[in-house]
Amino acid sequence: TLFVCLSHSSEPCRGRDIGLIARASHVCGAEAIAPERRQLAAAAPYGEWLIAGRILLSDLPDREHVVHTHASVTRRQQVFGYTEEELRLILAPMASTGIEPLGSMGTDTPLAALSDKPRLLFDYFSQLFAQVTNPPLDAIREELVTSLYNTIGPECNLLDPGPASCRRLVLPFPVLDDDALSKIVKINREGDLPGYQTYVARGLYEVDGGAAALTARLEELCAEISAAIADGARIIVLSDRHSNAELAPIPSLLFTAAVHHHLVREKSRTQVGLIVEAGDVREVHHVALLIGYGAAAVNPYLAIESVEDLARHQVYTSVAPEKAVGNVIKALGKGVLKVMSKMGVSTVASYTGAQIFEALGLSREV
């Protein structure tokens, strides 16, 4: 057991580094630990590994931008239960200002568990906040210590660092637009990034089968993703695109959490990164939940295509389509930072998989 006493130190130490030298059994200042620092820094060419290994999203080749028709956007809005109120009061203000809209005077909407209307799975969860022991951050005035930067890909053994430990795709923001996701889906198509492969899992199930079909499909998807990892996939995209009258989308939160915990049980979670391509995401709370339950990044494709369509037709917003999309992504990302800061979490990397939420009205099985 090592006992440390600081009360007899005569040196001022406020704002200075301190070090714990285990073999000397005492705490010392920055000058005393300088040799150990230099020794650790020179143990390996860490800087060279980082520069050579990091993969920047901006360096990936651009892909074709797809513009969806108004009829296509409207049809999918109906599939995912979009309302006129959400378009007018939530998405349009974000598209115009780049800031999450604020309301006042509370809400008379009943809890999702007590409502007689269909509700999204997101609505059954509420965010936790810091109480006493874990002080929150001020996401505005203390922005310097926060980061929305993340990396994705296989994680190597922390106790055996090497060049492979730095072979990661850098994501500057946790919310991706369609073009950025297209880059990731088609990564290594030209064979320029060996060892990186993306697998897209389609989260759709047969409508006629009901709950039993949903459960069976989730089990199939988990097995499918495990097989993809064994075949070399290092990025998994969980997508609910291409739904139709026969195939309904699985709620993205249920899909993400099921895959995340399956991979944890299989001890293969650190071999891949998860990205969610979801049509049911249109609020900050939705993005925060998906990240909290395992996603490294989220592509709210229908929200993006909706504001792009609104801007093209100058409905509820007067900004250009490209500006509207950028503003929505900015608003959602900054909103996630606000949610994280309420629990004292400063980086999105620490928030990924943290599950700092509570559920009301869901069975233990769900």
Question: Where in the sequence are the language-model features?
Answer:
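A glycine-centered beta-loop-beta connector
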Residues: T1-L2, R16, H242, L247
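Conserved structured catalytic cores and adjacent interaction surfaces
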Residues: Q197, G209-A216, E220, S226-H286, ...
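Flexible, glycine-rich loop/tail regions that form catalytic "lids" or insertion modules at the edges
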Residues: L2-T215, E224-A228, G232-I235, H286-V287, ...
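Short, acidic/small-residue loops that bind anionic groups at enzyme active sites
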Residues: H262, L302, A324
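Short beta->alpha connector loops at strand-helix junctions that form conserved
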Residues: S239, P300-A303
